[in-house]
Design a protein with these regions (language model features):
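Alpha/beta-hydrolase fold catalytic core
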Residues: 2-74, 96-99, 139, 330-332
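Conserved alpha/beta-hydrolase catalytic His-Asp/Glu region
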Residues: 42-43, 180, 202-267
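Active-site loop/oxyanion-hole signature of alpha/beta-hydrolase fold enzymes
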Residues: 54-57, 64, 103-144, 148, ...
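Conserved HGGG/HGGXW glycine-rich cap/lid loop of the alpha/beta-hydrolase fold
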Residues: 66-111
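Flexible "cap/lid" loop of the alpha/beta hydrolase fold
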Residues: 158, 167-199
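Short beta-strand/loop motif that positions the catalytic acidic residue
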Residues: 271, 277-279
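Acidic catalytic loop of the alpha/beta-hydrolase fold
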Residues: 282-286
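Catalytic active-site module of serine/aspartate enzymes centered on a nucleophile-bearing elbow/loop
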Residues: 300-332
Length: 332
C-alpha cells in the first residue's frame, strides 16, 4: 500500500484519538471552571423575599407560601430544573379559590440545600417531602407535581396516604411502561455514578447559555420558551454547589423500574384519594400513551389533555392550563 494512502487512512482515527485524549479533558476542565465561576450565590442569603427554609429529613428546603395558613393546602413540586418560582401565577389562582398555596424546592433544584449524603433516590426524596410537609404542620394536602417531580410525590403518597387529599400530576415521569427489574443500576447509571464523568456533564447542562435551548427541547410550542421563563429557570443556576448536587442526582433520573413503592403497578389501584392527570397533547418526553396507561392503573382518576402543549403545559398553554388546574381544585 502506498505511503500516501496509508497516511490518509490513519489520519481520521488519529484525529479522533487526539480529540479524545486532549479535547474531552480540556472541554471538561473548561465546563468545570465555568461552573465554579458562575456558582457563587449563597443560597439562604439570596433566597426570594418572603420565602423560608424548613427542615426536610437530612437537609433544609426552601418554601414559598401564599394565602391563609388556616386554609387547606395545595403543595406544588417542580420537575427537572424547576423550582418554586415557576408556580407564582398558579399559586395566586389557587389562593383565589380558597386554598393556601405552598411551593417546595426539593433538592438538588432551586434553593434547597444540597443533600450531604448525595442520596437522591425517589424513596428518600419522598421522605424529604413528607418531612417538609410535617415541618409546615400541614395535613391532608393536595399535591400538584410536574414531570420527574411526581416520582418522590408518589413515594410519599404510598408511604403515608393519610396525609394526601388528592394528587394533580402534570405529565408525570414515573417510568411505569418499562419492564420491572431487580432495581440494580443500568450501565448508564453506573457510568454517571463516577463524578469525573457526571460533574463535567452537569456543569455543561447547567450553563445558562444553554438554558433556552434545553427548555425548547422539552416543549412543543418553542416560542413559549420566552425570556421570562428562561430567566426563571436560570435563576438558581448561580447558586453554590448547584452542578455538583445535580451530578449526584443525575443517575437517579436514569433508573429503571425496580422495587420502590411507586414501581408496583398493582399498588396504584389501592390509593384512597383521587388523582387528576393533566397531559400535554404532543408531549414527547412522557407521551400521552403513558397518561392513558396510568389512568387505567388508578381507581379514582381523570385525564385532561391540553391541546398543542408538549411536556410543559403550564408554560406552553398558561391560560388553558390555569383553567384546567382551577377546575381540578374546585372539584375537590
Amino acid at each position: 500500500m502506498p505511503a500516501i494512502r496509508m497516511r490518509s487512512i490513519l489520519v481520521l482515527p488519529l484525529k479522533w484519538i487526539l480529540f479524545c485524549v486532549l479535547g474531552v479533558p480540556i472541554a471538561a476542565l473548561l465546563a468545570l471552571t465555568s461552573a465554579a465561576f458562575r456558582e457563587r450565590g449563597e443560597r439562604v442569603s439570596s433566597s426570594p423575599a418572603a420565602s423560608k427554609y424548613v427542615e426536610a429529613l437530612d437537609t433544609r428546603v426552601l418554601v414559598q407560601r401564599r394565602g391563609s395558613t388556616d386554609s387547606p393546602a395545595v403543595v406544588f413540586v417542580s420537575g427537572t430544573g424547576g423550582w418554586s418560582g415557576l408556580w407564582d401565577r398558579y399559586m395566586r389562582r389557587t389562593v383565589d379559590l380558597g386554598f393556601q398555596a405552598v411551593a417546595i424546592d426539593l433538592p438538588p433544584f432551586g434553593y434547597a440545600l444540597p443533600v450531604p449524603t448525595g442520596d437522591y433516590s425517589k424513596a428518600r426524596q419522598g421522605r424529604r417531602l413528607l418531612a417538609a410537609i410535617d415541618s409546615l404542620k400541614l395535613e391532608h394536602v393536595v399535591i400538584v407535581a410536574h414531570s420527574i417531580g411526581a416520582a418522590p410525590v408518589m413515594e410519599a403518597a404510598f408511604q403515608h396516604p393519610s396525609k394526601i387529599r388528592a394528587l394533580i400530576l402534570i405529565d408525570p415521569a414515573l417510568g411505569l411502561d418499562g419492564p420491572q427489574t431487580d432495581g440494580s443500576d443500568s450501565t448508564l447509571q453506573t457510568v454517571f455514578r463516577h463524578a469525573w464523568i457526571s460533574r463535567p456533564v452537569t456543569a455543561i447542562l447547567t450553563n445558562t447559555h444553554l438554558t433556552a435551548a434545553l427548555l425548547r427541547r422539552v416543549i412543543t410550542e418553542k416560542n413559549q420558551a420566552t425570556p421570562e421563563w428562561v430567566r426563571l429557570y436560570q435563576q438558581p443556576l448561580s447558586l453554590q454547589g448547584t452542578s455538583k448536587a445535580i451530578s449526584e442526582w443525575l443517575p437517579e433520573v436514569l433508573s429503571r423500574r425496580g422495587h420502590a413503592a411507586s414501581d408496583n403497578l398493582s399498588a396504584y389501584a389501592t390509593l384512597p384519594f383521587p388523582v387528576k392527570l393533566i397531559w400535554g397533547e404532543t408531549d414527547t418526553i412522557t407521551p400521552l400513551s403513558q397518561g392513558k396507561h396510568l389512568q387505567q392503573l388508578l381507581a379514582d382518576s381523570s385525564l385532561v389533555v391540553i391541546p398543542r402543549a408538549g411536556h410543559g403545559p403550564f408554560l406552553e398553554e398558561p391560560d388553558l392550563f390555569e383553567e384546567v388546574l382551577a377546575a381540578a381544585l374546585s372539584s375537590l
